[in-house]
Regions:
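Conserved kinase catalytic-core segment
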Residues: 177-182, 187, 191-192, 253-342
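Bacterial N-terminal signal peptides
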Residues: 6-15
Length: 450
């Protein structure tokens, strides 16, 4: 029986490799319309090659370069880091900006210089922010030296997104537990070989030009001097998007789960794409990701064909994935809770949210608008990939994401029950429950054959 399972797994993995080797392309013209991006979703992929990570790589995150740790040090962050930055107006220009407390900022050194996108130091005495309006109507902020009168030489500076808590930790609203959950969710996706943004735990962020609540204040400019005192945000996360270029016709880089369901059902997707889609839904089920809304999704190009003069660009490897994984490790709000939000980073809410409603029929709890049952090949593929999530790795991910301090309700319960080390006990609960989720996927019965 074990031999038969091993053969089936190898055949599934071979099919994955063969399908990955085939080039599925889509054209991306300069004046691309929103409806044209469906061609890229139709040939898109949900999966990457699964990485083999050392404990150091896992702890430092995907932007850490083991071959050159010092050079990559600016690119990744840890919970011990206190980062410095200059506010970059961004979310005030978005039509749908979400609810999580966040801002973008340009990366600075502790002594007031800037980092380039590749980590070189850029010393500047004084800067100015210029807001530009693009052809698609979108606005973006650029950085210039103050004495660049005609704005001729934009300064390319490393930048990233910061999410913060409100009120400050530990009395924060649990709606903003994305500071913790997104770190864990993105690391788990990375280990499993699914695309995700690069999210890091950070001790604090000192932001010049920020108010105490820049997201709520809807800041549209930054006229601060580099010598001004920063606002300091404690217990935050820093997020870098994937290095791929978004496919963004008319300013819209999203895709919908309903389109994915249609392509899955009507045969427009290959069998391999259907396997990837179901494997991805299983992976998201581990976290209880249930938000099937297009604005949280992104389509990007991981590989472009060489340009041909006069012809539209061709994407050789379109990737489709959920970009915002913050609403995880909780559950959906109640149907009568019209003005509430989905609990996230809440152990008591997440504990009951199993991957399957019925493991005997392989029926997903969070279907994401797709078929309730998943393919047996997707289950086999996930069983193989889940081998990288052993107990030590799972615990290390939750520790790095600071799950031991996230859920104050959980910690109070553990203290009241007499725990001598409630933070370690909290990690035990998160880890053991996640391992049960893994076992669910391994032991589920009657997944569909095709």
């Amino acid at each position: 029986m074990r031999f038969r399972f091993a053969i089936l797994t190898l055949l599934t993995l071979a099919a994955v490799s063969d399908a990955a080797a085939q080039t599925n392309t889509c054209q991306v013209p300069d004046q691309m319309k929103k409806e044209q991006k469906l061609a890229c979703v139709r040939v898109g992929s949900f999966m990457l090659d699964q990485p083999s990570l050392t404990p150091t790589q896992l702890a430092n995150g995907p932007d850490f370069d083991a071959a050159d740790p010092e050079k990559s040090r600016f690119a990744y962050f840890t919970a011990a880091d206190n980062i410095f930055c200059y506010f970059r107006p961004h979310y005030a220009f978005m039509s749908v900006k979400g609810e999580s407390m966040k801002f973008q900022c340009w990366h600075m050194t502790a002594d007031g210089a800037f980092y380039s996108p590749t980590g070189e130091i850029i010393p500047l005495e004084s800067v100015k922010v210029v807001i530009k309006t693009h052809k698609d109507g979108e606005k973006s902020a650029s950085l210039y030296a103050s004495n660049d009168t005609n704005n001729e030489h934009e300064i390319k500076v490393d930048h990233f997104k910061v999410k913060y808590l409100k009120p400050p930790y530990p009395d924060h609203n649990t709606r903003y537990n994305e500071v913790f959950t997104e770190v864990a969710a993105s690391r788990i996706m990375w280990v499993l070989g699914f695309p995700a943004d690069h999210v890091y735990p950070v001790g604090s962020a000192a932001c010049i030009g920020c108010t105490a609540d820049p997201f709520a204040n809807n800041l549209k400019d930054n006229q601060a001097s580099l010598k001004d005192a920063p606002n300091i945000f404690k217990i935050v996360s820093a997020e870098r998007e994937t290095p791929w270029e978004e496919i963004k016709p008319e300013g819209d880089e999203t895709w919908s789960w309903s389109d994915a369901t249609k392509f899955y059902a009507d045969g427009e997707w290959t069998h391999q794409q259907r396997v990837e889609y179901d494997a991805y839904r299983l992976a998201l089920g581990l976290l209880h990701y249930h938000n099937a809304i297009a604005q949280q999704n992104r389509i990007a190009c991981a590989q472009w064909a060489p340009n041909t003069a006069g012809q539209p660009r061709t994407c050789q490897k379109p990737m489709i994935f959920a970009q915002d994984l913050g609403s995880t490790f909780g559950k959906a709000k109640g149907s009568l809770d019209l003005f509430g939000t989905n609990p996230r980073g809440s152990f008591s809410d997440w504990e009951s949210q199993t991957v399957f409603t019925d493991p005997h029929t392989c029926g997903l709890r969070a279907t994401l608008e797709g078929d309730k049952q998943v393919l047996k090949e997707a289950q086999d593929l996930m069983i193989h990939r889940l081998g990288r999530l052993d107990p030590q790795t799972v615990r290390a991910i939750f520790t790095e994401a600071r799950f031991q301090t996230m859920d104050q309700k959980q910690l109070r319960r553990l203290r009241d029950s007499g725990s001598q080390n409630p933070e370690e006990a909290a990690l035990d609960e998160w880890t053991n429950t996640f391992l049960k989720r893994i076992q669910e996927i391994k032991s589920a019965l009657n997944c569909k054959e095709k």
